[in-house]
């Protein structure tokens, strides 16, 4: 019999953070770096825990080179060849601590990932990425990768509920990607009717992960620096961004003009565009679950990085958190009916 869960679930747009008394004199005093030791790999990582999504428009080597300068992380998309990786490792050895190799859950994916990790042993992060992290096959794949790479830190997802977070952590994953359908170019919710409001998903999944000394990534749903702050406030250890990093010089694809405006393409990894490019088209048994959009060309990503980090520091000063680590402890969310004044939007 169908069941209705009557508990209210909230998204970033449904809340604001309540300001609190603060002893901080300036945003400059806020420390955004975090240090994590991961449950299964036992590896330690230090940096600003914002990750560029492993989408082939934004998760590029060019993006990783800039992100690394800010101690930020990039999940490199899975469509680079072994030779591409070797060239990147030769030209940018300083970036290799701040990138992950991405893989699907197929045999070909595993073989390609293995060859990359053997050729570039400095890379210690693996991102196992499937649209539906609830399949038994994926859980078994995580166990297989953990057995094969016992000292690599494994990110795995995507899921949105605590019981699956726990299962993936106990199967060998260190960091669980949380989010089904919130992305700016994702249409899973409209095509399938499946999803979970991102703020509630993060709060619930963080609680489950932290109880096992695991970690989570809030993946998708951020439209502005304030949403990034809300994700951290909700308990996310890392926040993964795709759309907010789209349209920059460091993104894949050419700049083109339409009606006098400079634009770049940005598309979901389950879109017609991505499947035509990488899988020879959309298989007849499935539907596209992503969209392709033309986004304004924004120039170098440096300004966007500074805007996000500046907003995050400002959030911390408003709630009295001297470190990003303290933000979730200082966060009180209030439900609202309006986010901001829209007169000049």
Curated annotation (Swiss-Prot):
Its EC number is 1.7.1.7. The active site is at 186 (thioimidate intermediate), 188 (proton donor/acceptor). One of its GO terms (biological process) is purine nucleotide metabolic process. It holds the Pfam family IMPDH. NADP(+) binds at residues 26-27, 78, 129-131, 180-181, 269, 285-286, 314-317. Keywords: Metal-binding, NADP, Oxidoreductase, Potassium, Purine metabolism. K(+) binds at residues 181, 183, 186, 189. GO terms for cellular component: cytosol; GMP reductase complex. Homotetramer. NCBIfam families: GMP_reduct_1, PRK05096.1. Belongs to the IMPDH/GMPR family. GuaC type 1 subfamily. This is GMP reductase 1. It comes from Homo sapiens (Human). The lineage of its organism: Eukaryota, Metazoa, Chordata, Craniata, Vertebrata.
């Amino acid at each position: 019999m169908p069941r209705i869960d009557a508990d209210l679930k909230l998204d970033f747009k449904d809340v604001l953070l309540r300001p609190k008394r603060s002893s901080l004199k300036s945003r400059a005093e806020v420390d955004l770096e975090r240090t994590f030791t991961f449950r299964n790999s036992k590896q330690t990582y230090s940096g600003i825990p914002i990750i560029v999504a492993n989408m082939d428009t934004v998760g590029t080597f060019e993006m990783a080179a800039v992100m690394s300068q800010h101690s930020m992380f990039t999940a490199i998309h899975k469509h680079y060849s072994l030779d591409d990786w070797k060239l990147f490792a030769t030209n940018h050895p300083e970036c290799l601590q701040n990138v992950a190799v991405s893989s699907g859950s197929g045999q070909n994916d595993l073989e390609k990932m293995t060859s990359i990790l053997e050729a570039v042993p400095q890379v210690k992060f693996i991102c196992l990425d499937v649209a539906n992290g609830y399949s038994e096959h994926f859980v078994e794949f995580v166990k297989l990768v953990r057995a094969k790479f016992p000292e690599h830190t494994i990110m795995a997802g995507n899921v949105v509920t605590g019981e699956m977070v726990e299962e993936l952590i106990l199967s060998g994953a260190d960091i669980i990607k949380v989010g089904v359908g919130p992305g700016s170019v994702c249409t899973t919710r409209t095509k399938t009717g499946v999803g979970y409001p991102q703020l509630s998903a993060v709060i619930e999944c963080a609680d489950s992960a932290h109880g096992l000394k695991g970690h989570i990534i809030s993946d998708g749903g951020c439209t502005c620096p304030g949403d990034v702050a809300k994700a951290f406030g909700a308990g996310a250890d890392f926040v993964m961004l795709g759309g907010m990093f789209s349209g920059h010089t460091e993104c894949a694809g050419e700049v083109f003009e339409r009606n006098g405006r400079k634009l770049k393409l940005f598309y979901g990894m389950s879109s017609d565009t991505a499947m035509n490019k990488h899988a020879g088209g959309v298989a007849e048994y499935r539907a596209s679950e992503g969209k392709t959009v033309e986004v304004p060309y924004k120039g170098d990503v440096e300004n966007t990085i500074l805007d996000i980090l500046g907003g995050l520091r400002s959030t911390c000063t408003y709630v009295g958190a001297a470190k990003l680590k303290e933000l979730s402890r200082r966060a009180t969310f209030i439900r609202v009916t309006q986010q901001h004044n829209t007169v000049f939007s």
